[in-house]
Amino acid sequence: MARPFFRRRKSCPFSGKNAPKIDYKDVRLLQGFMSERGKIVPSRITAVSAKKQRELSQAIKRARHIGLLPYIVK
């Protein structure tokens, strides 16, 4: 019988010693976690931990409110 396929869990890109800080002013970093339409990509796709995903979404929403990021992209 064949072994069932399983995916290796990716590590969080914001954990570790040299990990980048989540900041609402760092637009280039935040755009990496948004879809091409401007939506926040879920953590199961980006492998971000739950705590860091909350910080990330808060930073994206803050940057949107200030006007650094668009709400939607047409």
Swiss-Prot record:
Keyword entries, A-Z: Ribonucleoprotein, Ribosomal protein, RNA-binding, rRNA-binding
From the Swiss-Prot or TrEMBL record, what is one GO molecular function term? Answer: small ribosomal subunit rRNA binding
Q: Which cysteines are joined by disulfide bonds?
A: none
Please name the GO terms of the biological process aspect recorded for this protein, alphabetically.
translation
Q: Does the keyword Ribosomal protein apply?
A: yes
List the GO cellular component terms.
cytosolic small ribosomal subunit
Tell me any Pfam family this protein matches. Ribosomal_S18
Tell me where on the tree of life, at the top rank, the source sits: Bacteria
Which NCBIfam families does UniProt cross-reference here? Answer: S18
Function as written in the Swiss-Prot or TrEMBL entry: Binds as a heterodimer with protein bS6 to the central domain of the 16S rRNA, where it helps stabilize the platform of the 30S subunit.
Q: Which family does it belong to?
A: Belongs to the bacterial ribosomal protein bS18 family.
Q: Subunit structure of this entry?
A: Part of the 30S ribosomal subunit. Forms a tight heterodimer with protein bS6.
Official protein name in the record: Small ribosomal subunit protein bS18
